[in-house]
From Swiss-Prot:
Cysteines joined through disulfide linkages: none
Family: Belongs to the RdgC family.
Annotated localization: Cytoplasm, Nucleoid
Protein name: Recombination-associated protein RdgC
Top-level taxonomy: Bacteria, Pseudomonadati, Pseudomonadota, Gammaproteobacteria, Enterobacterales
Organism the protein comes from: Sodalis glossinidius (strain morsitans)
A Pfam short name: RdgC
Single Gene Ontology BP annotation: DNA recombination
Physiological role: May be involved in recombination.
GO MF terms, alphabetically ordered: double-stranded DNA binding
NCBIfam families: PRK00321.1-1 (NF001460), PRK00321.1-3 (NF001462), PRK00321.1-5 (NF001464)
């Protein structure tokens, strides 16, 4: 299966009251269909197991995996600009007058309509994991905007999705700064060699460190001068490495070779069995990581609702 590369974590304010079968049924009304000749973009659900299954959900007890596909039509701006300039020039010569902005805008709309069937498509897929056992929704996305787009589609599909970003009681940057300053992260975590330090005042300085000893005097001087650690590379129990942001995002997930090879005894020809085992393994590891991360960061902020 496709292991998550990033995790945007959201807290469900109340449990999803649907069974896996009901989720499957409601997603089917929003299954992916390709763009028509005049569509700029379309999104819809596809089987997480790809061509190996028709099911729009893949589940193990307490956990459901979904996959959202998006198709975007791409028209190179240079092509549009060149063709539009040619049409504007011809019309202005024919009519012996300069076109107004409204005329140019109308001409551009007409041109886009004509060019759309010739546009090429860009496809993307995003995995979503419903952790029903812990009332979390996790999205394999590198940006909040991409994650929110996926959540909006899920909300539209199942009728309701009361989620908020997972939030800590204490500002994460304060905790990360203390970890680096003291050299003592929470139990189970080890500081790696990458960080971002920032002065939180407007137009404050930013220091990005890679392959650097974060326990050095140089880093200590920056912290003493008021910079806070806003991103920090961490290792969790020598099993998972990641970059934690002050907004709670977990990026650049890297699962250890030992972990990923754990299911190598399963015949790769048995795709479904291997997919199932990998999903079980990944959810188990990330559930443990997230639980220890929440505790290590001082606990979650009180839930609303």
């Amino acid at each position: 299966m496709l292991w998550f590369k990033n995790v945007m974590i959201y807290r469900l304010n109340r449990p999803i009251e649907l069974s896996v079968e009901q989720i499957e049924q409601q997603l089917s009304a929003f299954a992916f269909t390709p763009c028509g000749s005049q569509d700029m973009a379309k999104s819809g659900w596809v089987p997480p197991m790809g061509a190996k299954s028709d099911a729009l959900t893949h589940s193990i007890p307490g956990h459901v995996l979904l996959c959202l596909r998006k198709e975007e039509k791409i028209l190179p701006s240079s092509v549009v600009k060149q063709e539009l300039e040619g049409k504007i020039s011809k019309l202005e010569n024919d009519q012996s007058r300069k076109l107004r902005k409204t005329d140019k805008d109308a001409l551009k709309d007409e041109l886009l309509h004509q060019l759309m069937p010739r546009a090429f498509s860009r496809f993307g897929q995003t995995l979503l994991w419903l952790d029903l056992a812990n009332d979390l929704v996790l999205v394999d996305a590198g940006s909040a905007r991409k994650a929110e787009d996926c959540l909006a589609m899920l909300r539209k599909s199942i009728g309701s999705l009361p989620v908020v970003p997972l939030t800590m009681e204490k500002p994460i940057e304060m905790t990360l700064t203390e970890w680096v300053r003291s050299g003592e992260p929470a139990a189970g975590f080890a500081i790696q060699d990458e960080a971002e330090l920032k002065v939180l005042l407007e137009e404050g300085g930013i220091l990005r460190c890679k392959k650097q000893d974060l326990s050095s005097d140089e880093i200590a001087v920056h912290i003493e001068a008021g910079k806070l650690v806003t991103k920090l590379a961490l290792d969790w129990r020598e099993r998972v490495q990641f970059l934690l942001g002050d907004d709670g995002t977990v990026k650049r997930l890297k699962f250890s070779d030992t972990l990923r090879e754990q299911n190598d005894d399963i015949d790769r020809e048995d795709f479904a069995a291997r997919f199932d085992a990998d999903f079980l393994l990944m959810t188990g590891e990330l559930t443990g990581l997230i639980a220890e991360l929440i505790a290590g960061l001082g606990g979650e902020a009180p839930r609303q609702g």
